[in-house]
Amino acid sequence: MKPYDTEQDKKEQVREMFDRIAPAYDRLNHTLSFQIDKLWRRHVVRIVRRMQPRRILDVATGTGDLALAMARRMRGVQVLGVDLSENMLAEARRKATACGLDERVVLSLGDAERLEVADASVDVVTVAFGVRNFGDLGAGLREIARVLKPGGKVVILEFSTPRNPLFRRVYGLYSHRLLPAIGGMISKDRKAYEYLPASVDEFPAPECFMAMMREAGFKLSLIHI
């Protein structure tokens, strides 16, 4: 699905959407998740830290929250953050400079489906809340597999529709009614905050996504739903 009702392809619409909402993105992200998104990212950092990487690629880095958190918690690690949206990257660069991490976190404009990263050159690839925005999910997963060193790891943090019927009903009410209303009011782009929960609904179920990862060449070792 696409964020807007235009003839542009999904990738261009996603780029445009995040360029529009970038100034309010962090504030809305933390507020609308009740700060839980920070806990999820910390969990990812703990997982990645145990892998003892030297070079990390953070795909769909956005405003850089995960990339900066990894650099902050892992000394000596180089983090490359890639994103389609220049405005999101501008926010990330501002934050990297503010916390003195602009030399260890390299932020670049780029496409997850055509990464300008050498084959077998990174130890870990992370993607936080980004794979469902790929224009071609299979192509993006194959690119991630291409840039990983032999034995490298990918850590993906993503939403899925709750399985518990009661929780699913509450989630549906919040994500499809309240989230677009609040997000649209603050960001001035209601369509963006209608797309975000709808994109979760349309994302492949965990079992299907795992099958896609296997098809792209990954061996799954840890799954938490």
Enumerate the predicted regions with their spans.
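N-terminal auxiliary segments of SAM/dcSAM-dependent transferases
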Residues: 1-16
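Conserved alpha-helix/loop element of class I SAM-dependent methyltransferases that forms part
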Residues: 24-27, 34-55, 69
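Hydrophobic beta-strand segment of the Class I
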Residues: 25, 125-126
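Class I SAM-dependent methyltransferase SAM/SAH-binding core
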Residues: 55-59, 63-114
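A short acidic, Gly/Pro-enriched loop at the edge of an enzyme's catalytic core
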Residues: 113-124
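A short glycine-rich, Lys/Arg-flanked "PGG" loop and its adjoining helix->strand segment in the class I
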Residues: 138-150
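C-terminal alpha-helical "lid/dimerization" subdomain adjacent to the S-adenosyl-L-methionine
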Residues: 157-212, 216
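Conserved small/polar residues in nucleotide/adenosyl-binding loops
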Residues: 223-225
